[in-house]
Amino acid sequence: MSSPRERNAHSKGPRKSGQRAFNRKPDNGSDEWLWGWHAVAAALSNRKRSAPQRLLATPDRAKELESRFGRPKALEVVESAAMGQILPQGAVHQGIALRIPPLESVALEDFEAGRGAVLLMLDQVTDPQNVGAILRSAAAFGAAGVILQDRHAPKLTGALAKAAVGAVDKIPTAHVVNLSRALETLADLGWRAVGLDGHTETYLDQALDGGPTVLVLGSEGEGLRRLVAEHCDELAKIPMPGGFESLNVSAAAAVALYEASRTRT
């Protein structure tokens, strides 16, 4: 039986190889803010990051920062209420926030297709909490990286970064325009793509062979888009003996990463 990628190949053409005055409104660069201790500490520890533009901390948090990092030049000691007026409404900042330029996207060629290597690719997964939780799981299970869309994907800041608990700065991320073309490029680099699809007959453990694998996950409700699914080498599902398919995409990613990690041993 031919794979989704093989079936798709017949229908397409050839491949193309100190302290400031505070505004009472949210900062204009609100999409570049990180908040929460773990997210901020991970960013400050990441040598690939640019210099902080602003670093806000309550007096107690400022002491923690100084004991770990010295006194950062951008540090501004403020009260919690003042910080809440600068950040987007509802930000659970835990007394610390950092405005810093975003991390640069890595190239697909930078991912090493070694034995047991695993990448995650997210197809229109737009909920920041879910993407943050997926990054956290990717870090926990030693994934090589996560591939996101330039569009239809949340920024790696704010609530997403807080949900990731520092994983934004631990897991390399690649942003691509077209997931189908990205899968073609990865195939040329030695990666095999396994898409998660609850309607197929193949179970995930049967689809994994221990080689360099891209686990492709779609959005909740919609699942994988047709062209993305067609560019996968195989489609597989997570067995659910309870008969109640209730896993959200972040839980499914964690289960898939665990299953993939078993093939390394």
Name the predicted role of every residue range.
Residues 194-248:
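Active-site/ligand-binding-proximal alpha/beta "capping" segment
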Residues 114-201:
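RNA substrate-binding interface of SAM-dependent RNA methyltransferases
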Residues 129-133, 224, 249:
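Short glycine/serine/threonine-rich phosphate/pyrophosphate-binding segments
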Residues 59-60, 80-83, 151-153, 178, ...:
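Short, ordered loop/turn segments at secondary-structure junctions
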Residues 1-113:
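N-terminal positively charged helical leader segments and presequences
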Residues 41, 139-140, 162-167, 226-265:
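Structured adenosyl-cofactor binding patch, chiefly the S-adenosyl-L-methionine
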Residues 90-101, 164-168, 210-218:
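Short basic, glycine-rich beta-strand/loop surfaces that mediate nucleic-acid
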